[in-house]
Amino acid sequence: MNLKEFNNLTDLFFYQAERQNPDDIFLEWLNTINRKKYSWSQTVSCIYKLANKLKNYVQEGDRVLLVSENRPEWLITDMAIMLSSAITVPAYTTYTENDYKYLIEDCKPTVVIVSNNEMHKKLEKTINQNDFIKCVIFFNNLAKRDTKKKYLDFEIIVKDNLLEKDKIKKTNSKRTSPACIIYTSGTGGNPKGVILSHGGILNNLEGAKEIVEPLIDKRPIFLTWLPLSHSYEHTVQFVQIVVGAKIFYAEKIEKLLDNISEAKPTIMTAVPRFYQNLYSKININMKKATGLKSQLIKATIHFGRKNLLKEKMNFFEKLINSLLDILVRKKVKKQFGGNLKAFVSGGGALDKEIGEFLNAIGLPTLQGYGLTETSPVVSCNPIQKIKIDTVGPPFKGNEVKIAKDGEILVKGENVMLGYWNNEIETKKVIRDGWLYTGDIGEIDPKDGYLKITDRKKDIIVSAGGDNISPAKIENLLSNSAEIDQCMLYGDKKNYLVALIVPTKEFKGNRDKIAIIINKINENLTLTEKIKKFHLTEENFSIENGLLTPTMKVKRNKVTNKYINILENFYKK
């Protein structure tokens, strides 16, 4: 498969569909109440029928808003929208009514596709206020409405007969045509609509294919659980098509471990917060081990790290490490279905200690780097050579360089077409063809591996002018079993302070948290040391607006909420 030969993403899909057994299950939703399966042939049929229906309401370049949890119909709808020459605008299900209002009024969709009545409630008022919305399609639970708007049922659409002559078999979309507008969740301000092209995503798939193919020896299985409205998982669905995978959709985060056991994925993608939680849980269980079991675990981590870091091992050490593959690592993998070849981490920086630990215990973890604006992947570690403190070499077609101030710049087909309705912001970040990422990094001259050192706008500059990386210190805090979440504060101040969300067992235990902070301070420079801290009972969450949908802390929102407490630290 030569991805350079495809003009658009629908051409890619139909090319792959023609080469699959039409009766093989392609998509499966692990929903206990509404379990669904679609074979390759059923998926193709549904795409044709939905695209045909959409053509009654959209013209080339029109936007279609898609609001749904992860489920098979998500991929079907995305493909149908593109086949009708429209542009998919995916939106998070966790958005508020005001968020949806902003998105709808910004991108002006002709059609809104929503999963069910519950999700529709947050959109209904804005839908009724805007005449540019011609049609609303529900996946299920369509209730009758007294409205001029046209409401349609997905299930009825895909059951209708469609004559061969009425099938839209090809779209006019070119590689330079917009495929989707993905609104960045952002850690501050209104979200910006990132316009990604068909060619940008196809370009990204070339690099992804090189990462994934060495991990595959038979038809791969993926478990999709990150929101498909995020650029990371959105592009992963096309990677799944490229390799002819079977795709399972997780029911919900609370059922994730059960879903992993059932799906037995070959590859899993996740964000750093997932690995942080996993690290904490495994560590807690390992600390409970005694006797021989404890010794085996310690040896597994020790020799696993040596192997990962390419440190020399004698024959005896190599033999022990091989035995530990059977005695320990195989059992660890079995907890994730037994077929897992690799985790792929993206959507934020993975802590070095966590990365080393997971790789050492038998869970290969490949850290990558990207932005929504780069479709989204810039680079990723290959399984053949993992350098855990880096994000790997740049993907094919990605040109990467470091500016004088350390900022990472990216050029290539994968770079966005621009921000929707926002030429001013577009010109700020794309200059002379280079995307200014806002991330600080360095490139290893020996092998071209990229290393991220910080987020430019997150760097804290002390009153004395010292640059402090909050991510480094926050990772040290969050790696403690007693601390669930945290955020540093201290820009233009004489010292740093911290907001700490302890784990359930340590809520209000100020003395224990103080001991942990003092221990961490021992290994920090004078300007990095945390002088004061505040314990908060409330977790940072997506629901309270303090986390992005990919579980990154919204620094400005947290700061605004706790500003009086934070500023009071400097008055005492």
Regions from the PLM with identified roles:
Residues L83-I156, K504:
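Structural core segment of the AMP-binding/adenylate-forming
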Residues L202-I221, L228-R329, N339:
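Conserved AMP-binding/adenylation subdomain of ANL enzymes
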